[in-house]
UniProtKB/Swiss-Prot annotation:
One BP annotation, GO: cellular response to nitrogen starvation
The keyword Cytoplasm belongs to this UniProt entry's keyword annotation: yes
Gene that this polypeptide is encoded by: CUE5
UniProt name for this protein: Ubiquitin-binding protein CUE5
Organism: Saccharomyces cerevisiae (strain ATCC 204508 / S288c)
Phosphoserine PTM sites in chain numbering: S21, S36, S91, S220, S309, S318, S348, S407
Length: 411
């Protein structure tokens, strides 16, 4: 470096002694060369080994080639003069491969060997506080006088096993249990309340009568057995009874259907046809009687009879309905036939106490036509009613009263 600096100083002194004309020519030539592809000229001059600038300078001034300095050399010299830039540090420091707990304990206890420190770390399972206390006791035994040694091993809480994912059926079952507890809690509370009240009453009784303890114990056992029977055994019994009834019903129905198929379905068609007509005739009057009885069984309002001014029932033309019969009170007429009479039997001593037949008259149909009864013509009605007419109208003849006339219905 010192030799190069000496060469630079000598070259600068020589340049200062060159006349001004030479400097002007050099500046012109250098400006032209740099503006018009200076790189190409420099390359060609480097290949040929005869740069143009040096030739012109040598021709005009007669300076040696060794004394001339090119601009490339000047740039190199300037770079050598400036100090190199410092290397950039990496932003991310590489993590140390050594265990940080081990390194920390080494720094805290440099006097102890590394194997003891590792043994303490293994025993403490990486917990710093017990490891630090153990290493402190190794370095200074007097510091561990106040520390009590454990007599029993430390119990660790068992880690809960990984909960497996529940299926849809399990989720539904869990939800059903929650709903049952929520909505049926009232029934359970009522039951617990009843038990509490019973227990209170029984305790009061025991205080008054200490002999009832044994009886209370027996009663409690009976209640427990009864509650167990109602809650567990009764549903099973009901299920079994229902199943047995269903089975028996199915068996009976199958047996009846088989018997019907054997006896009735495969019967003789001729017997069915013979008895069919008779059965139909026997059943018809019963059906009619039932229908009539059903009609008559209904309550009916009594019919109201209406009579006209002549004492005749309205809507009935027959004489019998009027309640009037015509007969001769004097006896039989001459033309009418007298019915025959049976001879009377004399009573004997042997026949006393026996029933004797008496003569009876036998009615015979009348051959002659009887006279029909005709009603009397009505009386003329006065347009102007008077007291006499009104009284006469209101009065009734006792012979015309329907209740005093002997009718066929009363007979």
């Amino acid at each position: 470096m010192e030799e190069k600096e000496g060469i630079k100083d000598s070259s600068l002194l020589e340049k200062s002694n060159v006349p001004e004309s030479i400097n002007e020519d050099i500046s012109k030539t250098t400006d032209v060369d740099l503006n018009s592809d200076g790189k190409k000229d420099n390359d060609t001059s480097a290949k040929d080994g005869t740069p143009k600038v040096e030739e012109k300078v040598n021709k005009s001034s007669g300076i040696d080639e060794d004394e001339v300095v090119t601009p490339a050399e000047d740039a190199k010299e300037e770079e050598e003069e400036h100090p190199p830039l410092p290397a950039r540090r990496k932003s991310e420091e590489e993590p140390s491969k050594e265990n940080p707990i081990l390194q920390e304990l080494k720094d805290a206890f440099p006097n102890l060997e590394e194997k003891y420190i590792k043994a303490v770390i293994i025993a403490s399972q990486g917990v710093l506080s017990p490891a630090f206390n153990a290493l402190l006791f190794l370095s200074d035994p007097e510091s561990g006088k106040d520390i009590e040694l454990p007599t029993q091993p430390v119990r660790k809480n068992p880690e809960a096993p990984a909960r497996r994912r529940q299926t849809q059926l399990e989720q539904d079952e869990l939800l059903a249990r929650q709903l049952d507890e929520q909505f049926n809690s009232s029934h359970s509370r009522r039951r617990n309340r009843d038990r509490a009240t019973r227990s209170m009453h029984e305790q009061r009784r025991r205080r008054h009568n200490p002999n009832e303890r044994e009886q209370h114990h027996e009663d409690s056992e009976e209640e427990d057995s009864w509650s167990q029977f109602v809650e567990k055994d009764l549903p099973e019994l009901t299920d079994r009874a229902g199943r047995s009834l269903q089975d028996t019903a199915n068996k009976v129905s199958n047996w009846i259907s088989d018997a019907y198929r054997r006896n009735f379905a495969s019967g003789n068609e001729q017997n069915d046809n013979q008895h069919g007509h008779q059965d139909q005739q026997e059943w018809e009057p019963e059906i009619v009687d039932l229908s009539q009885g059903g009609k008559n069984s209904r309550p009916q309002q009594p019919e109201r009879r209406r009579f006209n001014s002549f004492g005749v029932q309205v809507g009935d033309d027959s004489l019998e309905s009027h309640g009037i019969t015509l007969h001769n009170e004097d006896g039989f007429e001459d033309d009418e036939d007298v019915p025959p009479q049976l001879p009377t039997r004399t009573k004997s001593g042997e026949s006393t106490g026996k029933v004797v037949a008496e003569t009876t008259y036998i009615d015979t149909p009348d051959t002659e036509t009887k006279k029909k009864w005709q009603p009397l013509p009505p009386e003329p009605l006065d347009t102007t009613p008077t007291k006499v007419n009104a009284v006469s109208r209101n009065k009734k003849n006792p012979d015309e009263d329907e209740f005093l006339i002997n009718s066929d219905d009363e007979m």
